Amino acid sequence: MSTDRSIRIGIAGMAGRMGSLLVEEAAAQGTVSGGTLRPGSNSPAPVGIPAFADINTLAEASDAVIDFTSASTVQAHARALSKAGTAWILGTSGLSPADEKAVEEIAALVPVVYAPNFAPGVNLVLALAEKMAAALPGNRYDAEIVEMHHRRKIDSPSGTAIGLGRAVAAGRGVMLEEVIESGRHGHVGPRQPGAIGFAALRGGQVVGEHTLLFAADDEHIALTHRAFDRRAFARGAVQAALWVQGKPPGLYSMMDVLGMR
């Protein structure tokens, strides 16, 4: 396509909190082909934006679909987008191993940008986290991740927190699943050497706060990102939808979009 303006961007779940922001950002930077509404939703479609009956028809009408819906829709959306040959910008968190497998399989057929967080600042934090973990040995520096979100958030720890944990684990040359300690309860004994701990807080209207702490006996180092407006995620997702045009099938991340790898 000759210009970004001609790129047709579809929005899955366009009447939700994120969906409405995505419509605004996509309309400013490209062409909104339309969107879907959550089944049973009483929220009206944004004015002037076509509402499609299902993900299949939206995929057929779009060059890229931005999807921040829910983990329960991932496998059905993967099938629809692969059939239509449409790029997928996926920001849904809380995916199961089966969901992640579906994402990997569709990436062999269409380009997929999958990220725990589309805010540029968070992705810089992820890159720094891996470098810091490589430089700060786990036998001296305990790694702890604390995140807080609004009271309605369903999954815990957040996708971004898990992404931070994976970055720390990669920097230390281990698998996160082997060293994760999430939500300690009661008397659990001393902290295990090399563990990566998680604590999740929920309350109020917090958009998203994440802190990675490296704690040694003689110093503490903290890396924090605070999101004050969901628009940061929406802008990043639309940036990814524009960037992915013309890319071959594959599984990409926001790091690729930002040219950080």
Swiss-Prot record:
NCBIfam families: dapB. The keyword Transport does not apply. GO terms for biological process: diaminopimelate biosynthetic process; lysine biosynthetic process via diaminopimelate. It is found in: Cytoplasm. This is 4-hydroxy-tetrahydrodipicolinate reductase. Its EC number is 1.17.1.8. Belongs to the DapB family. NAD(+) binds at residues 13-18, 91-93, 115-118. The gene is dapB. The active site is at 149 (proton donor/acceptor), 153 (proton donor). Its main location: cytoplasm. PANTHER family: 4-HYDROXY-TETRAHYDRODIPICOLINATE REDUCTASE 1, CHLOROPLASTIC-RELATED, DIHYDRODIPICOLINATE REDUCTASE. InterPro entries: DapB_C, DapB_N, DapB_N_CS, DHDPR_bac, NAD(P)-bd_dom_sf. Pfam families: DapB_C, DapB_N. (S)-2,3,4,5-tetrahydrodipicolinate binds at residues 150, 159-160. One of its GO terms (cellular component) is cytoplasm. It catalyses: (S)-2,3,4,5-tetrahydrodipicolinate + NAD(+) + H2O = (2S,4S)-4-hydroxy-2,3,4,5-tetrahydrodipicolinate + NADH + H(+); (S)-2,3,4,5-tetrahydrodipicolinate + NADP(+) + H2O = (2S,4S)-4-hydroxy-2,3,4,5-tetrahydrodipicolinate + NADPH + H(+).
